[in-house]
UniProtKB/Swiss-Prot annotation:
This is Uroplakin-3b-like protein 2. Its main location: membrane. It is a single-pass type I membrane protein. The lineage of its organism: Eukaryota, Metazoa, Chordata, Craniata, Vertebrata. It comes from Homo sapiens. Residues 34-204 are extracellular.
Amino acid sequence: MDNSWRLGPAIGLSAGQSQLLVSLLLLLTRVQPGTDVAAPEHISYVPQLSNDTLAGRLTLSTFTLEQPLGQFSSHNISDLDTIWLVVALSNATQSFTAPRTNQDIPAPANFSQRGYYLTLRANRVLYQTRGQLHVLRVGNDTHCQPTKIGCNHPLPGPGPYRVKFLVMNDEGPVAETKWSSDTRLQQAQALRAVPGPQSPGTVVIIAILSILLAVLLTVLLAVLIYTCFNSCRSTSLSGPEEAGSVRRYTTHLAFSTPAEGAS
């Protein structure tokens, strides 16, 4: 620092001018060439996949990362700054441009055009050594709309993907980590028929099993029909009988006997 103050008198500048010169030099070291925006601070951290023993570490549409614990303790980063996870195709990392405003943040719906999007919004309080987050599962939200900024939508294909963390505030990017290595998701494999002709023994076994299955189905059908037939015959269709006795009457015909001596 003392050498910087000696630079002013050496080139004929006063103490105030020397201080201004040093401030300008420090500012220029943080400004990207061709822009008026300060370059984000580089954090020497590489995102890593979670432990191999974790179930679901890699699926058809998700992968799980370790927490970046204690990686955002720089004095340039505030607790109010937003920490995004940038998800990109491996061949799109070179063309990635950090958004300057929240309106420029790409959503998962823009992934097919840009090759990257931002998700898993957080802050450094959640990434302390004893943070609240345990794992970061990328692509785990099946209910959010892909047009929504920050949506953790399932990944559309096997990849390969690369990720990094990006810190932003209202003025633009503040800091960023390094890109991760390539991550490839699992792929669904179609069922394949057994190659080569089947042996005669296999054909005989398949035929016997088919015959036994047909016989079993026939027996079951016959038992079902017999049971249903007997059940229908034994079912009474009359109503409940009334209790009581019925007296039987015999009908007699009354004949009048002619009176004796009648003429």
